[in-house]
Amino acid sequence: MSLKIRLARGGSKKRPFYSIVVADARAPRDGRFIEKIGTYDPRLAKDSGDRVKVNAEKAAEWIKKGAQPTDRVARFLSKVEVDGKAVVAWTHGNNPKKAEPGKKAQERAKERADKAEAKAAAAAEAAAAPAEEAPAEAAPAEETSES
């Protein structure tokens, strides 16, 4: 039996209130659950102590038994400590592939880089060519002065 620690919605319309419950993963969101281990009231201020209440010992016990917390509950449990340790080590999602641009954008960026490289090479050649020609122009000027 796959267990989840998740939120079960309660409260009335436009006034949400959630219970943090341990339930079978196949059970409906607000359906049957095994045990209620806390509450979450999103209407309270984020710094309020009553916003999230969790029985940390029960949560740690269920995690040891194999219950998987959802992302939101894992965030809550990472702030709760048992014996000086967070119940869950939660880090903000890191998906580097999601941040990469799409194929077309990568192709356009490559084309821009190639054009910039070509332009820089042309500018370098143009800067080097007049420097070489300048002494050649100076030499005929000297010859004309001698003749």
Swiss-Prot record:
Pfam families documented for this protein: Ribosomal_S16 (PF00886)
KW NADP (keyword) present: no
BP term (GO), one: translation
Any one GO cellular component localisation term in the record: small ribosomal subunit
UniProt entry keywords in alphabetical sequence: Ribonucleoprotein, Ribosomal protein
Residue ranges that the Swiss-Prot or TrEMBL entry lists as coiled coil: none
Highest taxon of the lineage: Bacteria
Residue ranges, annotated region (Disordered): 89-147
One example GO MF annotation: structural constituent of ribosome
Residue ranges with Low complexity bias: 119-147
Biased composition (Basic and acidic residues): 97-118
Annotated PANTHER family: 30S RIBOSOMAL PROTEIN S16 (PTHR12919), SMALL RIBOSOMAL SUBUNIT PROTEIN BS16M (PTHR12919:SF20)
Family: Belongs to the bacterial ribosomal protein bS16 family.
Protein name listed in UniProt: Small ribosomal subunit protein bS16
The organism of origin for this protein: Hyphomonas neptunium (strain ATCC 15444)
